[in-house]
Amino acid sequence: MEERLQKLLSAAGLCSRRSAEDYIEAGRVTVNGQIAKLGDKADLSRDRVALDGVEIGPAAEPVYLMLNKPRGYVTTLSDEEGRPTVAQLVADCGVRVWPVGRLDLDSEGLLLLTNDGALTHRLIHPSHEVEKQYLVLVSGDMEAALPVLNGPMELDGVALAPAQVDRLGPNLLSFRIHEGKNRQIRRMCQQVGLTVKALRRVREGQVQLGGLKLGKWRYLTEEEVALLKAL
């Protein structure tokens, strides 16, 4: 059955439909060796569709994983500097999956991985405001910092969406945010004079890390997948 190229590229897990439109307009997509244009359709059972010369096949069976990422691993599939990657930790799943969003090199905890391009786009797009929770071990004056962390803040001159920050212990904070700016929590803490000693993501949406051991992964349950798709 013929389908629009942007739908085929997204279903193959290569990009979102919006990104696929940009790739088509840039001349990076071909059908049977001919440069495609917006509005073109193809049938993968008979047509050869390629992005940047790499041919795509029929959509793979969707796979959804949860990894408890250790510190020291980059949230990429490969690294030019030769650092350990999260892809190495889930290689035994037997399917090519990619991270949903990112988790800093020095951070640990819940990281979702999938080959579902549509769900990836939904979870990382700011308009969906998916809440994430982090446990953060800090040093510094927490009493003075808490009101500021819960109030209006900026990074690089841009206002942040409100965060919910609660004190759980003498040096332990819970951050609930639905943005994912680069090193956001560490930079927020730095602004209020706190030093981050450890940072762990424990929840994304309603999916929780639970007791999964550090460096291990598991498949999401059907219920967890449904919760993510409902966001």
Language-model-detected regions and their locations in the chain:
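Basic, flexible Lys/Arg- and Gly-enriched helix-loop patches that mediate nucleic-acid binding at interfaces
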Residues: M1-L231
